[in-house]
Amino acid sequence: MSAQDFLVELGSEELPPKALKSLATAFLAGIEKGLAAAGLEYRVARFYAAPRRLAVLVEHLVAQQPDRTLNLDGPPVAAAFDAEGNPTQAALGFARKCGVELHEIDSSGAKLRYSRHIPGQPASALLPAIVQASLDELPIPKRMRWGTRKEEFVRPSQWLVMLFGNQVVDCEILAQKAGRESMGHRFHHPDAVRISQPSSYLEDLRSAYVLADFAERRELIAGRVADLAAQQQGSAVVPEDLLDEVTALVEWPVPLVCSFEERFLTVPQEALISTMQDNQKYFCLLDANGKLLPCFITVANIESRDPAQIVAGNEKVVRPRLTDAEFFFNQDKRQPLESFNQRLASVVFQAQLGSVLEKAERVSRLAGFIAERIGGDPQHAIRAGLLSKADLASEMVGEFPELQGIAGYHYALNAGEPEDIARALDEQYMPRGAGAQLPSTLTGAAVAMADKLDTLVGIFGIGMPPTGSKDPYALRRAALGILRILIEKQLDLNLEEASHFAVAQYGTKVKASGLAEQVSEFVFDRLRARYEDEGIDVSSYLAVRALQPASAYDLDLRVQAVQAFRRLPEAEALAAVNKRVSNLLGKYEGKLPAAIEARYFDNASEFSLYSALQQAQHAVRPLAAERRYREALERLASLRDPVDAYFEAVLVNAEDPAIRANRHAMLAQLRGLFLCVADISVLGQ
């Protein structure tokens, strides 16, 4: 079957840069979906995207849709005709549904069947509808109309290229008649560009100063920015989302180095970086020590004969932004950080939970409680908690909200606070996202956990837990943040105890009954989802959770040990044995003897298991006490043979009550050893 390349390019006014990549990938996905539904095979498809165009190139697309046979089954033949052979209403209704006469329907099988041969259509006849459907399904939150047209799109359409092979596909989409003329660079090549065939698309546009390949432009910008940064003896700060956005802003990228006055370097560099990245889309440069250099890189969309003019223009534009940041910083420094707390008394944290100042006071007390239990400095944590929200009332954070915590760090140092306290003001918001950096100090860890736990307790306490996909207070993220800090920093904290303390700080603002348990259960449940993401069996988590450990760090050590135990050859049999033992003990009526007495043994396997249990007990309990859970389970795995022999030779529910009690006591000791780590019986369910 013959095949040719297919190209579609929709030209428009400048597309939203932050959405360009997602629009392009969705456009490609929609076309691939349409081709698959139509049965049109192809070799490969890829998207291209630039500020004024979305394009898809499909290589080696078949020219003809394959023929199909449509089979429709109707009612059973017995129900389709009466005893005299006359058609029933069921048969007549099926014929009407198929749009044919009854004699055209096959009645030779168990059911009536109508088969129709559907010849395939030319690909060129199907492509317009496929493209239109893909455009209709693009993730555009708000479409617009332009002029007097009824068509809607994210931006007004300007032209349409649609080629199958070297032939134009005859159609009209978004009020644009398909042709082979695209447009070049707005300034370097403002004239139309003739696309001779799909395979020449990139080169035809390149000759018109347009790099249509998003990935190529992105790589070019990243490489050139890195080279220019090296020439300045620095390295560029290149966030992925900023690189994508800049790539979406230019068709012919030309990176240039600009500079600003060194006096601005007295301002916290995070503020300067923030304004240059967010407002101007510049790439900032750092020296070998991570300090901001007084220069930046802008990416022009034009190859100027006088690049110095572009450099001067960008330097002129950025200066007022940096001056504003400098002004806010100097204004804020005129007063002690703690004085900002007065303004927080009138700022609402949550209508039912009081002001931000009240939250800071609660966080302060809770942070001191936590710090004492994780080996930190309670007084530092109390002080850091009290100052934790002060910078929210500053001019700097008012202008740059993303600097909350960072501004507090600098203002705390300026006010003479210890480094440990100042750093905690920044670290309270850590981790700022999945996999993000954790607090480096115990004071920071204490304040970060206190802040998150206070929010969890408060929102749960007024009956507003997350429901389904709705989590307006980011409580799931807060819970995961607490867990990451505890587990990855190996901090031992009784979460339920901390939750009870947090509940007490709210007084009558929350419904306290059962609240601490509800919050700690919610936090631990986030671990289940985390383990699933990491490929750890849910049953490993449930086996440990059955013991209700209060420390997330301890729970994680146990889960990792159980997961390793599962890979041992003895694991499956011992899990089944634990399940059996659990059932036997659950059905036993009466009090178990305090000690196992060998005088009741009447079988060699009893002596063997008893001896193995005594040896295991001396080895396992010290290992468990030292939290060497993996070694403990490896040692318990050696019990498989004596346990198997015991159950083969011994009737646990003996008729003699004393013997029966003694045997159950030995099983209780066996189970108790495993419960030093986890309820292994869960693995056998």
Swiss-Prot record:
Belongs to the class-II aminoacyl-tRNA synthetase family. The lineage of its organism: Bacteria, Pseudomonadati, Pseudomonadota, Gammaproteobacteria, Pseudomonadales. Tetramer of two alpha and two beta subunits. It is an enzyme of class 6 (ligase). It holds the Pfam family tRNA_synt_2f. One of its GO terms (molecular function) is arginine-tRNA ligase activity. It is found in: Cytoplasm. This is Glycine--tRNA ligase beta subunit. HAMAP family: Gly_tRNA_synth_beta. InterPro entries: DALR_anticod-bd, Gly-tRNA-synth_bsu, Gly-tRNA-synth_heterodimer. The keyword Ribosomal protein does not apply. PROSITE patterns: AA_TRNA_LIGASE_II_GLYAB.
